[in-house]
């Protein structure tokens, strides 16, 4: 039995297979996920698990060089955006429209669906390298 890090086998598997510039998304419970994209559904009940708990856990295991965040997240969920920025370290933030973010989900290795119910609690993480 794995004793540290992410215990969810689907998330752990996706992260371990990611290469430089591959993408992984984390979203709120309302984010529409394309049929062709792997869905890892963690949503249990309202706000469990939270977007931030999920992001923090993934960031512990995935080297991230850039993220895509919807403009609406910064504008309409500013408190959440402040928390996101704290977790990102030196990762570059690229702002795009919410529609563009939804369109980019089809290029992600997977989308992790959380129980989050904060509007625009969505992010695309682009993998970096550890060397």
Curated annotation (Swiss-Prot):
InterPro entries: D-ribose_pyranase, RbsD-like_sf, RbsD_FucU. It is an enzyme of class 5 (isomerase). Substrate binds at residues 28, 98, 120-122. GO terms for cellular component: cytosol. Keywords: Carbohydrate metabolism, Cytoplasm, Isomerase. The active site is at 20 (proton donor). Its EC number is 5.4.99.62. It catalyses: beta-D-ribopyranose = beta-D-ribofuranose. Pfam families: RbsD_FucU (PF05025). It is found in: Cytoplasm. Pathway: Carbohydrate metabolism; D-ribose degradation; D-ribose 5-phosphate from beta-D-ribopyranose: step 1/2. One of its GO terms (biological process) is D-ribose catabolic process. GO terms for molecular function: D-ribose pyranase activity; intramolecular lyase activity; monosaccharide binding. Gene3D superfamilies: RbsD-like domain. Belongs to the RbsD / FucU family. RbsD subfamily. HAMAP family: D_rib_pyranase (MF_01661). Homodecamer. PANTHER family: D-RIBOSE PYRANASE. Catalyzes the interconversion of beta-pyran and beta-furan forms of D-ribose. This is D-ribose pyranase. It comes from Clostridium tetani (strain Massachusetts / E88). The lineage of its organism: Bacteria, Bacillati, Bacillota, Clostridia, Eubacteriales.
């Amino acid at each position: 039995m794995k004793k540290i890090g992410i215990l969810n086998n689907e998330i752990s598997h996706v992260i371990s297979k990611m290469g430089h510039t591959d993408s992984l998304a984390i979203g709120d419970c309302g984010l529409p996920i394309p049929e062709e994209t792997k869905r890892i559904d963690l949503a249990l009940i309202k706000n469990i698990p939270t977007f931030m708990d999920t992001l923090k856990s993934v960031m512990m295991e995935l080297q991230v060089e850039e993220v895509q965040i919807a403009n609406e997240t910064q504008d309409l969920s500013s408190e959440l955006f402040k928390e996101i920025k704290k977790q990102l370290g030196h990762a570059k933030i690229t702002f795009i429209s919410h529609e563009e973010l939804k369109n980019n989900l089809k290029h992600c290795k997977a989308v992790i669906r959380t129980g989050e119910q904060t509007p625009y609690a969505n992010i695309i993480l682009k993998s970096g390298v550890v060397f």
